[in-house]
């Protein structure tokens, strides 16, 4: 940790400096080249109109995702701290890789929209991080960030440019992709003994309360996430309204289902922290379609129920039968709702509410996102396990003290 992690971190940042030096310029420089006799103020003003949406998405990345993972009582430092680390790397690498893919190797002109797209690419890694939370080293996470964003950019290009599929809120390309990539990595890195649980894989009253803060930030800003890259004002309007309605419906069904499957009808905080967000994930693909307000409510309701049922029945099955330990339950918050989102878009096109794509291309996009995620995740897992290595021992899983200076229990009691 003392030498390997700092060396890799510094080398990666040095690489970013070199790459940005050769390939990245300000968007205003492109405007000056294309229209040398005109002022750039108009285009800059239009770009700055996206800044509030960028900030909303930024809050989701750093505060929402970070605090959502603080439910583990002895892993809060890593949940928020490593989230910041990989997000900082992911934003730089995402800007470069996506720029290279879409500009076909030419100069990248960075603007607010590029920064939003970089946030999106980083979100995939943070989703995957939830599947391996507590079982992976910071060094391994840096390498995983580089590989995953590269695979993500390739799949996003295939879905958007080749298949011409509609996925404005990225239910398929971000949520489903990130979840199944993370599950594939978790499967390769699986350690025997996790099937029966780990003594440190527990929450406490205050850690669950911190995680709920992350939930609330994500819930409030999800309409911005789904509408940030809308091409027209009408599409943005539809995305905001549809996401809002799906989220509120999701909350009701998530609470109801949690009580139904819970012990003595009690609510489970794990369900509430996660399943209440599933509506935002599920409606993402068809958020800019005229699916009618009741359609958004239906999608959100289904997502809330599917997510809770996944936590209650599917997660234990994945661990016991398939040897895939999903720490945060990303399969239930992002994976299954992401699939619901892809299927919802197919149904929407079938019913004639959208002509943005075809059912075949939407199905192909869903298959490509899941397939590339699993393949990329398996390869990444093998690289992390046998080449990068450094995974903590099973006894040190879910423990901040392995990588952080942690106050002793007596010091905490005196505070």
Curated annotation (Swiss-Prot):
Transmembrane segments: 3-23, 52-72, 77-97, 116-136, 143-163, 168-188, 209-229, 237-257, 269-287, 291-311, 333-353, 364-384
Glycosylation sites: 37, 40
Record Pfam families: Ammonium_transp
GO cellular component, one term: plasma membrane
The keyword Amino-acid biosynthesis is annotated on this UniProt entry: no
Entry's Gene Ontology BP terms: ammonium homeostasis; ammonium transmembrane transport; carbon dioxide transmembrane transport; carbon dioxide transport; inorganic cation transmembrane transport; methylammonium transmembrane transport
Keyword tags: Ammonia transport, Glycoprotein, Membrane, Transmembrane, Transmembrane helix, Transport
Post-translational changes noted in the entry: Glycosylated.
Cytoplasmic topological domain: 1-2, 73-76, 137-142, 189-208, 258-268, 312-332, 385-415
Assembly: Homodimer. Heterotrimer; a RHCE monomer interacts with a RHAG homodimer. Component of the ankyrin-1 complex in the erythrocyte, composed of ANK1, RHCE, RHAG, SLC4A1, EPB42, GYPA, GYPB and AQP1. Interacts with GYPB (via the N-terminal); this interaction bridges the (RHAG)2(RHCE) heterotrimer with the SLC4A1 Band 3 I dimer complexed with GYPA.
Cited PANTHER family: AMMONIUM TRANSPORTER, AMMONIUM TRANSPORTER RH TYPE A
Function statement: Component of the ankyrin-1 complex, a multiprotein complex involved in the stability and shape of the erythrocyte membrane. Heterotrimer with RHCE (RHAG)2(RHCE), that transports ammonium and its related derivative methylammonium, in both neutral and ionic forms, across the erythrocyte membrane. The transport of NH4(+) is electrogenic and masks the NH3 transport. Also, may act as a CO2 channel. Moreover in erythrocyte, regulates RHD membrane expression and is associated with rhesus blood group antigen expression.
The protein's name: Ammonium transporter Rh type A
Organism: Canis lupus familiaris (Dog)
Source taxonomy: Eukaryota, Metazoa, Chordata, Craniata, Vertebrata
Gene name, Swiss-Prot/TrEMBL: RHAG
């Amino acid at each position: 940790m003392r030498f390997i992690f700092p060396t890799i971190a510094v080398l990666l940042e040095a690489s970013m400096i070199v790459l940005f030096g050769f390939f990245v310029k300000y968007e205003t420089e492109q405007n000056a080249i294309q229209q040398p006799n005109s002022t750039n103020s108009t285009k800059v003003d239009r770009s700055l109109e996206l800044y509030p949406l960028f900030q909303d998405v930024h809050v989701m990345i750093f505060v929402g995702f970070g605090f959502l993972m603080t439910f583990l009582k002895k892993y809060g430092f890593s949940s928020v701290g490593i989230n910041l680390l990989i997000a900082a790397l992911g934003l730089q690498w995402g800007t470069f890789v996506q720029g290279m893919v879409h500009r076909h190797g030419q100069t990248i002109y960075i603007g607010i929209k590029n920064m939003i797209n970089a946030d999106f690419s980083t979100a995939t890694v943070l989703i995957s991080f939830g599947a391996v939370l507590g079982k992976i080293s910071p060094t391994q996470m840096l390498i995983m960030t580089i590989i995953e964003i590269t695979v993500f950019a390739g799949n996003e290009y295939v879905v958007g440019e080749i298949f011409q599929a509609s996925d404005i809120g990225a239910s398929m390309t971000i949520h489903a992709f990130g979840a199944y990539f993370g599950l594939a990595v978790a499967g390769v890195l699986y350690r025997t003994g996790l099937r029966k649980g780990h003594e440190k894989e527990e929450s406490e009253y205050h850690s669950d309360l911190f995680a709920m803060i992350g939930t609330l930030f994500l819930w409030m800003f999800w309409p911005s996430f789904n509408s940030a890259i809308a091409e027209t004002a009408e599409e943005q309007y539809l995305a905001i309204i549809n996401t809002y309605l799906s989220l509120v419906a999701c909350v009701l069904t998530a609470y109801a289902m949690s009580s139904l499957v819970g012990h003595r009808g009690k609510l489970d905080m794990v369900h509430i922290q996660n399943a209440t967000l599933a509506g935002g994930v599920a409606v993402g693909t068809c958020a800019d379609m005229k699916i009618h307000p009741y359609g958004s409510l239906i999608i959100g309701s289904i997502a809330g129920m599917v997510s809770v049922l996944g936590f209650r029945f599917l997660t234990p099955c994945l661990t016991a039968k398939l040897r895939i330990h999903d720490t945060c339950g990303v399969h239930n918050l992002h994976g299954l709702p992401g699939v619901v989102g892809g299927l919802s878009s197919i149904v929407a096109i079938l019913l004639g509410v959208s002509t943005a794509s075809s059912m075949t291309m939407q199905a192909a996009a869903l298959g490509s996102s899941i397939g590339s995620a699993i393949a990329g995740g398996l390869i990444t897992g093998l690289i992390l396990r046998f080449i990068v290595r450094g995974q903590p021992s099973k006894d040190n899983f879910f423990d901040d003290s392995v990588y952080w200076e942690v106050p002793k229990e007596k010091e905490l009691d005196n505070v």
